[in-house]
Amino acid sequence: MSERTTARGVPVDGGLPGWRRAVGGGAFALFWGWLVVRWIHDWFIVPNPAGDRTPFVPVGPFDAANEVLLSLADSLGVLGVPFDWLAGVFAFAAGAIPSLPALAQGAWLTVVLTVVSIALGFVLAVPLSVARVYGGLGLRWVALSFTELIRGTPLLAQLFVLYYGTNLTVFIRNVPGVGMGMVPDQAVWVAIIGFTINSAAYQAEYIRSALTSVHSGQLTAARAIGLGKVEGIRYVVLPQALRYAIPGWSNELIYLIKYSSLATFITVGELFNQTESIANDTYRYTELFVTAGLFYLALVLSASLVMNSVEDWTAIPGIGQSGER
Amino acid sequence: MSDLLRVDDVHKSYGDEEVLKGISFEMDRGDVDVLVGPSGSGKSTMLRCINRLTEIDSGEIYLDGENVTTPDTDVNALRRNVGMVFQDFNLFAHLTARKNVTLGLRKVKGLDKAEAREIADAQLERVGLLAQAESYPAELSGGQKQRVGIARALAMDPKLLLFDEPTSALDPELVGEVVEVMADLASEGMTMLVVSHEMGFVRSAATDMFVLDDGKIVERGAPTDLFENPEHERTKSFLQGLNSAHGGDG
């Protein structure tokens, strides 16, 4: 690989070697291509909200292959063990394939929960972290109390309080349009609110520590040319701090993808919820949860890839990890 | 009251320690005055009180006849008129040299992009760094960083420029380029108050030299007078120390 650099001339490590990059890229293209086609197909081409969606890949050939391999394995005695395993793979596929359309629908909600909550959480986290570092005593105390309360209690408890313990659920249910057509129902909105609040607290911690790692002379210099304190933070400190925060922040994104599975407990039909309900109906626990695990893995790896790119795009010589020389 | 800057009996304490014990001096337009003195004598604190990065305890400071130490002074407006150059440069690390200079023009003075860029490029050219306009601070040498720092302060078109030990964080071979820029500014009539032990600059460019010791100005005068006939014992020993440290210096 020739040495790559970002738009601002920061060298980027070469990444994976060519063939692994090709295989990885192919797998991502396959996963996301299938997922997006599945979504479009199920919402617009053959809308069928009641369920019972046909997988794109028929189960028959996998069953047949399983049968053939099993009988082959039988006839070969001890030598047939590898064929026995291979038969298991086809049996696994045959067991998993019928659930894929439902898992794709679940994955949609998982993506929505994660992306919307991390984005809204970020909007809250920036002022929270700035209040922690630069606020007066009162503001600092409020921000600290919020983050410690949220980080110190279980996310599931927070979701239950929001969903069962407040009027939020009823309030959202009565908002016109909620639960109609493409608009998700009240449980999804409550989950988004819960994840947003929770994620804001964690994100605020990552950004706070990044803020304190920006040299104090930066704000002094900003003040010295006549910028106010808030402007100095806005134009000088935050642009640097947010770059420092990217690696830690990426962690929070990855956590949230997986924590979003807790929404199942307040009846949100996300990926984990779909998996569990099908598994309970079919008793195919292994097939379902391994497949769901692969879905989460693909989502997490995608998030990592995106964040690596974000880090490269925003890299500036002398700032953050990739800028170190 | 034609002084550009008048500092009148300024006191400042940090906790129990009084750092400035009644400092008074004044500067005319075009003056280049240098504060010297042992470390801890209050030189940098004095500078930072003038643009109110540090708040004074008592006394008054007048810029262009206006008391800038009242509670209702607009500090941001004051700082537009008083530029500052820092010991450790403090260039905005995420911005190119050009954007370091344009930030204040855009966000403080509200100029549009083209105007700001024009001024920035003129100032970068003045310090000999137009070719580095697109470089980030991490890509510049210490001397180049400090020259960008000077361009950034100049771009705001200040009435007074404060230099807080502008060359003491530099490798010796990079001091010259910064001193040269400062000497050019001095000869162009910029009013400058400089904390520096760079005796080459003091001799060639300074109007007056103030010797600070223990929070007071113990002696002031033209550099040649002070170098040749220091009256105060502290001045003598301080200048001797400097001369031996700088290998004779001229």
Label the model's feature ranges.
Chain B
Residues 3-5, 11-214, 218-223:
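ABC family nucleotide-binding domain
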Residues 224-250:
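C-terminal boundary and immediately downstream tail of ABC-type ATPase nucleotide-binding domains
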